[in-house]
Amino acid sequence: MEFSQFKVNALMEITARPDLVFVRGQGSWLEDHAGKRYLDFVQGWAVNTLGHCAPEMKRAMAEQADKLMNPSPAFYNLPSIELAQRLTSASCFDRVFFANSGAEANEGAIKLARKWGRVNRNGAYKIITMNHGFHGRTLATMSASGKPGWDTMFAPQVEGFPKAEINDLDSVRALIDAQTVAVMLEPVQGEAGVIPATREFMQGLRKLADEHGILFIVDEVQTGMGRTGSLFAYQQFDVIPDIMTLAKGIGGGIPLAALLAREEVCVFAHGDQGGTYNGNPLCAAVGVAVFDTITAPGFMEAAQARTRQLSEGLLALSAKWSLRGERGMGLLRALVLDRDDAPAIVEAARMLAPEGLLLNAPRGNLLRFMPALNVTEADMARMLEQLDGVIAAVRK
């Protein structure tokens, strides 16, 4: 079937898409309508924890679909209870509210913090966030984000999100006032170019929050669920946040997110928060399967081996092509280029024949890599070899 035969005009135009339609996927590979295969190092922007169509997920979904799909969040269901127990047992948090997307989880975190401020800090509502941070595309989460240009898009913004600089504790300290209720950040700024927070900064934020009696919120929508080398990124900084959000990897490809909080922060009253599909057993059962897979013996050790392979490979390419190095945490990494030809490299990689390569360029001079956590050694080596050839072709 030719691309022109697909009625793509029925879809609302929100981004520039290439002329291809993906029809199937397996592991680290996708196949389009013409039968061409692509090695996928985007994986839905770090969504597909176990790759495409993971057997563990398919099995969990099929078994749950045969039992119960959505009785309404007004009632308890077993998979959501099981997943909540797993998440709290593996973290510093006591309670979980399930949602459907990262933006929805972050909206919940904002609401919970503001409610806590009303109860405990005389109505304090401001949440300090970071320049170049990304927290979602609802009005509140766009306002919380620090992407250039978003301060005027869909204006007026939701008020109450002063911006500090990541890894600059003084910039945070200068913004704290009587109306401040929390500080919120991504442990690794993904859209900004894969910029990790430093250990000193994260620990400084925790200390600053304690000194001023405010909350410390980590947005682990992209960094959580094994992506950065530990189950949750905050665990590598030796800090205890008050609130954490998860999405992307927790569902492994299906819409699932979570808002986690310590007991003393859980101030929602009945009716303060909700959602038609939140914590439905179908998605929660898949979340249990994803959690159990990545916490099984040997899984994270294998992912860490692929992290070393990716980091070393990117450093070798950087040295060969006189680039500016690589950075990141775990299997969320970036190759920093010496010029703004990342979009051209992404395009050339996708156009490779007979098999393409899918990469991401959040900045003109930067490539981001977000493979499945169970990517094979062979597929990692293949990607690095293909990328070397693409750089050569683009820069010839």
UniProtKB/Swiss-Prot annotation:
Belongs to the class-III pyridoxal-phosphate-dependent aminotransferase family. ArgD subfamily. The keyword Oxidoreductase does not apply. GO terms for biological process: L-arginine biosynthetic process. One of its GO terms (cellular component) is cytoplasm. Keywords: Amino-acid biosynthesis, Aminotransferase, Arginine biosynthesis, Cytoplasm, Pyridoxal phosphate, Transferase. InterPro entries: AcOrn/SuccOrn_fam, Aminotrans_3, Aminotrans_3_PPA_site, Class-III_PLP-dep_AT, PyrdxlP-dep_Trfase, PyrdxlP-dep_Trfase_major, PyrdxlP-dep_Trfase_small. It is found in: Cytoplasm. N(2)-acetyl-L-ornithine binds at residue 137. Pyridoxal 5'-phosphate binds at residues 102-103, 134, 219-222, 276. It catalyses: N(2)-acetyl-L-ornithine + 2-oxoglutarate = N-acetyl-L-glutamate 5-semialdehyde + L-glutamate. This is Acetylornithine aminotransferase 2. Pfam families: Aminotran_3 (PF00202). Binds 1 pyridoxal phosphate per subunit.
